[in-house]
Amino acid sequence: EGGIRTPLLIRWPNRIPPGVESNEMVHVTDMFTTLLSMTGCKAPADRLIDGVDQSPFFLGKQETSNRESCIVWLKDELHAVKWKDFKINFKRQQHFHDPELALGFARITHLKEDPKERDAVNQRYVRWWVMQHAQRIIRDFENSKKKEELIPPGAPRDFVPKKFAEA
């Protein structure tokens, strides 16, 4: 899955059940909200938070993750959307050092059937409904950018968004 699907190991004796394996989706941004929740703290309410609280999932209180999608951005370009068992690519890179090429159409892959993303399932009317979900995810993200600016790629460590600099 091009670096999206990577292992996550968690150990917290007497809190997190040992020996559990899962293929549920968790994003690195979820760690912030999850760790806050697990330590009894609350996420700041004055800004948008990308992560979702995964503590019920990690603690074994539920079998599914609280995340069903993530957006893959490189610098300021949308590359893909992962939704449930599907990945929708808008750019393609054959090998790690090759240039990324924009696709003329979205390339949809069912990751359980094809984890190496070799065959697209773009047959007309077969997976078109997946694009509806991808478009909703992208639209929600674009709307969030209108509410709060993104931290630009390469921003200095002391970067402060305008919203907070003016306060």
Name what the model sees in each region.
Residues E1, I16-V20, E24, T29-K116:
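C-terminal cap/loop subdomain of S1 sulfatases and analogous C-terminal strand-loop tails that border
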Residues G3, G51-V52, M131, I138:
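Alpha-helix initiation and N-capping motif
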Residues R5-L9, F105:
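Catalytic cores of eukaryotic secretory-pathway lumenal/extracellular enzymes that build
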Residues L9-I10, V28, W128:
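Active-site-proximal cap/loop segments of hydrolase catalytic domains
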Residues M31, W83-N89, Q94-H95, L101-R107, ...:
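Long, internal low-complexity/basic segments
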